[in-house]
């Protein structure tokens, strides 16, 4: 068994997994924050992770993205993603405060529900074609849809993904109190899924995102319109 060290600021022990889903590697790892432990690294994510005082910075190299264009001409499966396994038979909520460094169009910080490279959901704070920063959601089932949502003028945003086993909701907040619904999906994903965080720089030369207050709980929100309650 080959063993590699794969973190910039901590010793994250990584061993290759048998199934390689991503173009640049799919490995087990152990990166621990106060309320979540990431156990899987896609596309070298653990090698580009820095943890300090409970905060995590994840860097993306140039031209990294996860997107499968509906026209079938583009498929980029190279974004660094840190994941943790989740029992989808039970409720869950993943929340994080995200502060991207925007340098180029489509730079973003994201949250994921991940099954495989052509079956996933992501929610992002992204820089659009006009240079505005906005919420974006993408659902990939073979190919990717792409949805632009509200413009965000603050430098940071709280993002939340929650499921009661039947419905998945995407939400954002500027104050961690009042939540805005972005999108609802039917939860028709497998019994075991992966959830996590990512950074992307599809057109740029790389960027980084600061993730704070990353929390995974085994409860869902109670109001899927307001995004509140346990």
Indicate where each model-derived feature is located.
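Bacterial Sec-dependent N-terminal signal peptides
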Residues: 1-23
